[in-house]
Curated annotation (Swiss-Prot):
Belongs to the UPF0182 family. It holds the Pfam family UPF0182. The keyword DNA repair does not apply. The keyword Plastid does not apply. This is UPF0182 protein CLK_3152. Coiled coil: none annotated. It comes from Clostridium botulinum (strain Loch Maree / Type A3). Its main location: membrane.
Length: 893
């Protein structure tokens, strides 16, 4: 027996080790990785919190269960159920082990589930905003109330668990006794047996349950600020005047009932316990009835008047929660009275009008600039750079390795040789080549660079497509980039990675379930494994409590490529704020900057006023840096994030209204404008463009994220919503309200105007008939002074699998003028150089009469040849025919 006991503990430890083997390996690797990225203290913050919490919670659980068990055993020994039972200590030892395991398990579950809420509670930061019902700071609801709710659920669950296990224990012991004593089970004696066995214990537990029902209704009182019963989110008239009153009564009565219950136990009386439970149930049922009666017989017929103060609470706090309370609102009286001087004064804005569109440009990149089949461009970013002394908006993208495309896709190729992408491409958004393709300023491998932007180390070890580990500094040289018939190789000179000692090779062989770590002769002691290379997953691994933007963007700085990811703090616990997409508060509180070569990951706080990010900073010391610590050249490229702007636009469509009466009537609802990408195609919500523009009262151009609003379910544009992002203007928002008594074309109405123009529609029909497809680009509506200039690029795509869309024409519209031109500059000249549109139209008709028919036929011939060459992929012939067509058209002109 002693030998068996001696073997039990080591056997138990071995079983635990086997059960948690993979977790142990993963834990060791995590320690090594967090140490490598200099965030080990962040990783240990969670572990330290869990361990510190587990100790007192384990003691509480262990002692509570043990004392409860002892009290049951005392009653058992006095009762009939104990006759004939074995009285040795084996049962006590068994229960001790059981209690120890259960208490450890429960303590771990609780600590690992709620460590974060406890730390948030302890490091609470005031919002300096109070809710209008209970006058508590918002921090109470965001940082403290969630912990109270969690504790309530855990304690109620534990008390119910004790009740259930008490009944189970009684029935097991009763059944055991009856079997041993060979007596029949009498159901009539169960009530007496339970009272004798655990009457006091169950009464105490019942008293505690009633006490915590009181606490639960106190939580329900606070949760009224999230009520959805009224016409707006948050506590309504019924909630405040009926539900709240009953909740308060229930809190008081249940508190008294719990005291009465405990006193009754001391006196040995159980009837008051039943009465208290009955009263509690009656009050809970009565509350629902009372709320129903108030809502239907008092509120319903007077709803607009009674609900106004609560609607105002909802409006004010929703606007605060989504950072819409600081929008600068201005009237934009459309005059359309631009002069030539106004055009000259806004030359930088006009020179940066985007005629390249996202989707066609990405297609072109992935056909022309991937160089080799194993490269890819994941997406295109838009940014602004000073190029050769001029402020330019550009498209740019990183050329990453697509390891899934490798052929052969061997372990060495995937993890040792093709370790990184190479280079970037950049083109100005406002210019195309004579063939209608993006006009590159940075392209090719090695980079051909026409700018003053240095790119001396264009390697990409960390990116959006780098989803696998690589091993660097091996005996095999890494593939760097292709050069004619040979390949350039490279040795990694960055500091990322974990050294591949034998122990580490063994750990990763187990972790990755790959024996190659041990068998490969290419791995040296100095070799390093680089893991967590996907930039978003890397940021999430370090700071999983932040929400990350769906579109990281690249920046070229100091000769290298860097990535910027917008990080958000969110909650769904902001009082009175209407939830959107599962949240009712959001701030872009941090920017994550990642080096594409070294993998250095830095978190910069960009919104010091946000209490949630300050709460995180107190919990995770050393994680965040101040914004000023980021290099100036990086800060210049911080963008206002589109994900945030999108949700703010959605909220603004309803919450631009500040008057509760108008809000109640739903009189003034907006929606983001619709747009159409294909001629006769479906409509979709317009994608907010980043544009370079000079705000009406400003002297300098800047990049602005702009959205266009319509009246709900109408196509008339009603407002322009912009977010600024250059220099000290970063984060400022402005709303231009357009005149409601005029028809202002939205992007969709602008498309309809194009389709209804006889000259343009004929041109579009001609292109579509020639075996090609006409596609619209990205619609831009540019405010200039008190006028709106509309721009629509037109793309032509030949039929065929590998056809490339090409930007062939630009449609411009100003006031009542609509022109189809080969470029922005030509279109501007055509619109603004004619003082009398009627004379201009007459001249056009006269010039049409004098055109030589033979030249028209020749132009049509070269056009048809060009289309045929495009279909066949003969780009040399295509270019020649287009040039000939251009010469003929110039002669006609």
């Amino acid at each position: 027996m002693k030998n068996r006991k001696a073997l039990f503990i080591p056997l138990f430890i071995i079983i635990l080790f086997i059960a948690f083997f993979n977790k142990i390996i993963n834990f060791i690797i995590n320690i090594k990785w967090f140490k490598e990225v200099n965030y080990l203290t962040i990783y240990f913050t969670k572990m330290r919190a869990i361990i510190i919490l587990m100790i007192p919670i384990f003691i509480i659980f262990f002692i509570s269960i043990w004392m409860y068990y002892k009290s049951l055993m005392i009653n058992k020994n006095k009762s009939v159920v104990d006759i004939g039972l074995n009285k040795n200590n084996y049962g006590k030892k068994l229960f001790f082990i059981f209690n120890f395991i259960v208490s450890i398990f429960l303590a771990y579950i609780f600590s690992s589930s709620y460590w974060y809420r406890i730390l948030q509670f302890n490091n609470s930061v005031d919002f300096n905003v109070k809710d209008p019902i209970f006058f508590k700071d918002v921090s109470f609801y965001v940082f403290k109330l969630p912990l109270f709710e969690s504790l309530y659920k855990v304690i109620i669950s534990l008390l119910l668990f004790l009740v259930i296990t008490t009944f189970i224990a009684y029935f097991i012991l009763e059944a055991k006794y009856k079997i041993q004593s060979k007596k029949d089970i009498n159901l009539k004696n169960i009530n007496h047996g339970i009272k004798s066995f655990a009457g006091k214990q169950l009464a105490i537990v019942s008293g505690l349950i009633i006490l915590f029902i009181s606490f639960g209704h106190l939580i329900k009182i606070w949760n009224l600020v999230y009520s959805s019963n009224g016409v707006s989110f948050g506590a309504s008239y019924t909630d405040v005047h009926a539900t709240l009153l009953f909740y308060k009564i229930i809190v008081v009565i249940t508190l008294i009932s719990s005291i009465v219950t405990l006193l009754s136990i001391v006196k040995g009386k159980f009837k008051p316990v039943s009465i208290c439970i009955g009263i509690t149930i009656f009050l809970i049922v009565s509350q629902n009835i009372a709320s129903f009666l108030v809502q239907n017989f008092i509120v319903k017929s007077n709803e607009k008047t009674l609900e106004q103060p609560y609607i105002k609470n909802n409006i004010d706090l929703t606007r605060k929660a989504f950072a819409l309370d600081d929008i600068e609102i201005r009237d934009f009286d459309i005059k359309n009275d631009l002069q030539k001087q106004d055009i000259a004064d806004n030359k930088a804005s006009i020179d940066n009008i985007r005629i390249n569109s996202f989707k066609p440009t990405l297609e072109f990149y992935n056909q022309v600039q991937i160089i080799r089949y194993y490269y890819t461009f994941n997406d295109i970013d838009i940014d602004r750079y000073n190029i050769n002394g001029k402020y330019n908006q550009v498209f740019l993208a990183a050329r990453e390795i697509d390891t899934d495309a490798l052929n052969p896709n061997t372990w060495q190729n995937r993890h040792l040789i093709y370790t990184h992408g190479f280079g970037a491409v950049m083109n100005k958004v406002n210019s195309v080549t004579s063939e209608g393709q993006p006009d590159f300023v940075i392209k090719d491998i090695p980079p051909y660079n026409k700018t003053n932007i240095k790119l001396t180390n264009p390697r990409i070890y960390f990116g959006e497509k780098t989803n696998d580990y690589v091993i660097v500094n091996t005996k095999i040289n890494e593939f760097d980039y292709p050069k004619e018939d040979s390949n350039k190789t490279n040795k990694y000179n960055g500091h990322a990675g974990i050294k591949m000692s034998f122990i580490n090779r063994l750990l990763f062989a187990i972790n990755k379930k790959d024996i190659n770590f041990l068998l490969s002769k290419d791995i040296k002691k100095d070799s390093k494994i680089i893991i967590n290379r996907n930039i978003v997953e890397r940021a999430k691994k370090i700071a999983p409590f932040l929400t990350y933007d769906s579109d990281p963007y690249m920046v070229i700085y100091n000769g290298k490529i860097y990535w910027i990811i917008d990080a958000y703090t969110t909650t769904n616990r902001y009082p009175y704020s209407e939830p959107y997409d599962g949240i009712n508060y959001i701030r872009n509180s941090a920017k994550v900057v990642i080096d594409s070569v070294d993998g250095d990951t830095n978190f910069y706080i960009t919104d010091k006023k946000d209490p949630i990010v300050n709460n995180y900073a107190k919990i995770f010391k050393g994680l965040f840096k101040e914004e000023k610590d980021a290099p100036k050249e990086i800060r210049e490229h911080f963008r206002y994030p589109k994900d945030l702007f999108s949700i703010q636009s959605k909220v603004l469509g309803k919450y631009h209204v500040k008057d509760p009466g108008v809000f109640y009537n739903g009189e003034d609802l907006w929606e983001v404008s619709k747009d159409q990408k294909h001629v006769e195609g479906e409509t979709n919500t317009n994608d907010a463009p980043y544009i370079i523009m000079k705000l009406p009262d400003q002297n300098k151009e800047e990049m602005v994220l702009l959205n266009y609003f319509n009246v709900m379910k109408k196509d008339n544009m009603i407002a322009l919503f912009g977010a600024r992002m250059d220099g000290e203007q970063y984060g400022k928002k402005i709303l231009y309200k357009l005149p409601s008594d005029k028809t202002v074309y939205s992007p969709y109405l602008f498309k309809q105007k194009i389709n209804q123009d006889t000259n343009i529609s004929k041109e579009l029909s001609l292109w579509n008939r020639e075996g090609s497809q006409v596609q619209y680009g990205d619609t831009i509506i540019l405010p200039i002074k008190n006028s709106l200039l509309y721009i629509e690029p037109l793309y032509l795509r030949a039929s065929g699998k590998n056809s490339i869309p090409e930007m062939k024409r630009v449609i411009l519209s100003y006031n009542d003028r609509l022109v189809l031109s080969s470029s922005i500059q030509e279109g501007i000249k055509e619109i603004f150089n004619s003082k009398d549109n009627k004379i201009n139209d007459k001249n056009e008709k006269d010039s049409t009469k004098t055109i030589d028919d033979s030249k028209l036929k020749k132009a049509q011939e070269y056009y048809n040849k060009a289309i045929e060459a495009q279909k066949n992929g003969d780009w040399t012939k295509y270019g020649e025919d287009i040039n000939e067509l251009g010469n003929i058209l110039n002669n006609i002109k």
